[in-house]
Amino acid sequence: MCDMSHLRGRQRVRMGVGGVLEVAWPVAAQPVRPMDASRQRLKTATPSFTVAAMPLRCLRLLSALLSTLVSITVPTLAIAAVGVQAAPPTPLLSTPLVPQPLTTDQAVVDAIAAFYTKHEFQVPMRDGVLLHTTVYVPKDESRRWPFLMTRTPYGVPPYGVDNLPDASNHRRLTRFAPSFALIQLGYIFVHQDVRGRMMSQGTFVDVRPLLKRPLTSDVVKDATGVDEGTDTWDTIEWLLHNVPGHNGRVGVWGISYPGRYAAEAAVSAHPAIRAVSPQAPVTDWFVGDDFHHNGALCLADAFSFYANFGRPRPTPTPTLKWDFEPDHADVYDFYLAMGPLKNANRRYLHDDIAFWNELMAHENRDAFWLARDPTPHFTGIKPAVLVVGGWYDAEDLWGSLRTYQAMNSQTAKNRVTLVMGPWAHGGWARSDGDSLGGVSFGHKTSHHYREQIEAPFFESHLKGSGSFAPAEAEMFVTGLNQWRTFDTWPPQQVKPMTLSLADDGVLSTTKPTSTTTRSWFADPAHPVPWMEGQYPELDHDYMLKDQRFASRRPDVVTFQSPVLDEDVVVAGPVTVDFLVATDGTDLDVVVKLIDVMPDNATTTTTTTAVAPAGQLRGGAQQLVRGEIMRGRFRDDFAVPRAFVPGQAERVRFTLPDVLHGFRRGHRLMIQVQASWFPLFDRNPQTFVPIHTADDADFVAHTHTLHLGPTGSTITLPVLTRTRP
């Protein structure tokens, strides 16, 4: 016999994908104790029923029962249509805590006030440090709720148990939960200041190194043996024993720096963690994220961030001052006037910013940087993982891709899912995702992600509602404005298209028969700007802006294909293999992949998915991807090597992955330059330590690309092989 008496409660049934009936039973109503004012330890609650715990004979009986059930309508969330495809069936979600969809910021703050109770705690870590933790518990005590936690260095305002979120700051409100849909559905939301930040005790360490795991008993007992993983573990233990009304399951999420902490939560291996979502996670600050790309310092981002974020915090504080103001109206002019990097401390920071000093002290990828790369620890991850990133994320695009690759290669199959959409940093959470920088994407891509992917992910793994069975990679094709799915990323069904750079400025699949060169003169006193015009600060929409201004410069060399006679979809990393020489002793190589639109292309505001590549006008040169390589690191990031003047050498590197459709009638273009300022610091083009270089070290030089049968090439991974 199969005893199913433990399934008491209202069953919820609806028609699922492909006409399959789906059913879920909510946990039977149980009394929930009010929050203990003295914060004494409470007995951990456990769920009364999970499908995984059912005997096989029960599962068979349940399967037979499902075949006879009739679909019953339940409250669901509205789902946006996706591209040219019909909207997929609404996933089975739990009965919402909040009856009405939360479509405005005011509706969100009203719902938090009406349906949640706020608590604040100082949660003890194993070394005695107390971390400020805010917990919002659903007022509905008839159900047990999973925890959904984020840990952050940016603060968890408003502070004070009687102060609730308001609608005055949309960006801050989006940090409350992964999406407003999840606030509607109901979770125990946990927000924590990481150690040493804001109202938490202890010392903050930027990109704190992870301890080697498994932790030995002496490290566990040692008060100095702490990292973000141990703090996550200790926090979860405390929550399970001190916050009533939970179902024993924990999800961890975060965007950017909190995204790193989410990834490290998976490393902590606490058994209560069932779902983790690192979104734009900070990963490796020397190779590809935030503050360095291939060894080149991301000058404007690093300086502007640490001039504010990096200020000393002697004691816990609820306020974070972010008020550094450049003394120039234009960001390009400000950093050019700053001069050599050492002037940042001399003129502005005055050695007060600890991590800026670390940046300056570690110019190469030494042990300091290796210890701060978490990816070697991404082994045997147990929770389900949803990695999210944006194709136009100017800060942590690389981190999303690298985190997925590292976890996927070291974790059981089908536990790691990657989602990449047409978003800037955090755009999937903070915007509709229907356009960016004047380029239309045809529909509200962020709504599709939040409602079709993210909400079902957490609902399935934390509540057991419905089934979440995505493809391993759910990816948006820019240029074509379509969602596509892949079994892995980069996809296996690609073929390399190697394009040779020819002397006549042509990109060709045919190798040149003669050896030639293309040279340009690069002056560090007049570096190539990141965008045309004046801007008081970085505008991260530059990642898809028109590059015609750069093509007109004599210090930028361009190569383009003939007009494409069919669509070409590039899917994966783009490989640069240049043979380059300089009459100096160092240089940077910047390569941009560009989509050149036909001269007769027109602006579009269409909402269909098969629109042209957006709202850029005819002849526009839309940036698809760009990357820099600091030449001295062409062999090894740890061991820089000078160029011998006049001697050609191989410089090989990859541009971060793309998934872009170059449409029929368009052209492919490559731009090559030696600076991209102030996105990246200037290379003096003299082989000296750049972080301590003097004005006299910055010298103009001529750089030369060698072309021909064994010359410079770029290789694109294409889904549909098309010869330009």
Predicted regions and their residues:
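N-terminal cap/lid segment of alpha/beta-hydrolase-fold proteins
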Residues: T104-E141, Q560, L564-E566, V639, ...
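Cap/lid segment of the alpha/beta-hydrolase catalytic domain
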Residues: S142-N242, F291, R430-F441, T585, ...
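Residue-level detector of structural "landmarks"
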Residues: E22-Q30
